């Protein structure tokens, strides 16, 4: 871990050649010659570029030039952050953070279709349990640091892998590890049902009033969601007692959210609670997003109020501070039928990176740091626009695990036409749609093994070609 993007070479007499052993990420290279006793001549200086081989079956193109540029920038970023595992960046750390890898796996599944590689990353992620029962935030490493949300992200990545591939063998084999993680965090619940964690309680790079010894509201909802998923795995494996326990604890967690973490003075859920300070002073989009996305609210009225805050953010709420957390915000907005808003926001925020003539996505947005634009200029968690474009703008919805079935639907976005390809375990789906003369024309090439539901396409001119 560290900024290891330089090297020293001590010259001998005469012509010689040298190739560095360490992988270095860069856009520009600076050569410095120190203390020469005579002129130094460079005959050749170059870079040897290398990325992991990929199926790379996905593609996208549209009549929106800026959106195309952003898609290419994000896809290139993802490719540069793929080594023997997903890494956060090719320069600053080159580390396999298991929370970052969740977003990378969603991107790769929809854009590249490297399913064996997704499985490999999940298996490597399981080794994070060797450092600490909380799961280390990155692995393999001797730096012991845990972020609870990263452990829960590893579990949701397993769930998405199953949905992409219909392969349940991985979750079955990893169930003992999942059970161990769930049991540890259940042990962190206090008498009232709060997940009181003493650790790095990070949700986002933003000024949330949460502490290292804290019940974090969004984290509480995500843990309840993971317990429900683990209960399903337990039932499938014949561990009925585990399933009952996990579901009971998930309900306790949600009741705690409802009874303890609601701030009646602002009619919103607090970002957290600490034994020293009580309820947090801040309320945020981050908390509302995780509560909504992971079904953390029991009370129907509080759920309605929270959805209203997502539809129209109050001024006093803290906004998402990083490309990382916008992944979750965008998922909720798309579920509300606001894909058009999501794509326009992507063009605004990622378009700002393009204005600086960048070819890759930054870790944070311009303005986050006072004295620099960003820390990492090529960061995998910032490549999620490729995922949203692929999954939602093409009008193809996965209707069954493993893409055994898909559902077609018209797309409400500011595009005149777009085309693209989606990888599946049955083969590639090719899509092209356009709006001409007030009519939407939709052309689909789809493997014969995939069922197609086109009930929502009655107003469109539809051609389905089986391959």
Predicted regions and their residues:
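Extracellular/oxidizing-compartment recognition motifs
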Residues: 1-88, 100, 116-117, 121, ...
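Helix-terminus loop motifs that line ligand-binding clefts
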Residues: 1-4, 112-212, 348-369
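The feature captures the catalytic groove of carbohydrate-active enzymes
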Residues: 5, 11-14, 83-85, 132-153, ...
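Alpha-helical support elements that line or immediately flank enzyme active sites
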Residues: 29-34, 99-128, 155-168, 286-297, ...
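Structural helix-adjacent loops and short alpha-helical linkers that scaffold large soluble proteins
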Residues: 36-43, 65-67, 110-123, 129, ...
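Conserved hydrophobic/aromatic pocket- or pore-lining residues that grip, position, or stack substrates
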Residues: 74, 104, 167, 223, ...
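Non-catalytic C-terminal accessory modules of carbohydrate-active enzymes
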Residues: 236, 255, 340-467
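Extracellular polysaccharide-recognition and catalytic grooves
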Residues: 280-374
């Amino acid at each position: 871990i560290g900024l290891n993007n330089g090297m020293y070479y001590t010259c001998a007499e005469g012509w010689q050649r040298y190739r560095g052993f360490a992988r270095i990420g860069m856009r520009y290279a600076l050569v410095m010659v120190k203390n020469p006793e005579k002129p130094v001549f460079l005959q050749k200086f170059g870079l040897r570029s290398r990325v992991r081989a990929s199926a790379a079956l996905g593609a996208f193109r549209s009549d929106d030039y800026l959106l195309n540029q952003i898609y290419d920038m994000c896809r290139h970023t993802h490719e540069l952050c793929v080594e023997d595992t997903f890494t956060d960046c090719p320069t600053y750390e080159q580390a396999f953070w298991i929370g970052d890898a969740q977003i990378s796996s969603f991107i790769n599944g929809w854009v590249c279709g490297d399913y064996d590689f997704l499985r490999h990353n999940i298996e490597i992620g399981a080794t994070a349990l060797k450092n600490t029962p909380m799961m280390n935030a990155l692995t393999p490493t001797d730096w012991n640091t845990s972020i609870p949300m990263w452990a829960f992200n590893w579990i949701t990545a397993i769930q998405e892998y199953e949905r992409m591939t219909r392969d349940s063998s991985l979750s079955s084999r990893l169930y003992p590890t999942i059970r161990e993680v769930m049991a540890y965090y259940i042990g962190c619940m206090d008498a009232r049902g709060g997940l009181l964690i003493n650790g790095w309680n990070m949700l986002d790079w933003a000024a949330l009033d949460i502490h290292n010894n804290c019940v974090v509201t969004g984290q509480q909802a995500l843990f309840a969601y993971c317990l429900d998923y683990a209960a399903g795995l337990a039932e499938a494996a014949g561990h009925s007692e585990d399933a009952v326990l996990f579901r009971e604890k998930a309900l306790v967690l949600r009741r705690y959210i409802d009874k303890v973490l609601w701030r009646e003075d602002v009619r919103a859920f607090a970002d957290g609670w600490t034994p020293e300070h009580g309820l947090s002073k801040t309320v945020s989009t981050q908390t509302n997003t995780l509560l909504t996305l992971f079904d953390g609210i029991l009370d129907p009225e509080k759920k309605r109020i929270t959805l209203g805050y997502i539809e129209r953010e109050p001024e006093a709420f803290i906004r998402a501070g990083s490309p990382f957390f916008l992944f979750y915000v965008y998922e909720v907005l798309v579920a509300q039928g606001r894909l058009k808003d999501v794509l326009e926001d992507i063009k605004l925020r990622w378009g700002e990176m393009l204005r600086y003539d960048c070819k890759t996505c930054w870790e944070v947005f311009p303005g986050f740091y006072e004295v620099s634009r960003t820390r990492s200029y090529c960061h995998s968690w910032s490549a999620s626009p490729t995922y949203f474009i692929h999954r939602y703008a093409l009008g193809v919805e996965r209707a069954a695990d493993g893409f055994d079935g898909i559902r077609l639907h018209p797309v409400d976005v500011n595009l005149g036409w777009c085309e693209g390809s989606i990888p599946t375990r049955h083969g590639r789906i090719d899509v092209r749609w356009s709006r001409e003369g007030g009519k939407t024309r939709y052309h689909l090439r789809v493997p014969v093994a995939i069922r197609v539901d086109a009930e929502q396409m009655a107003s469109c001119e539809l051609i389905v070609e089986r391959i």
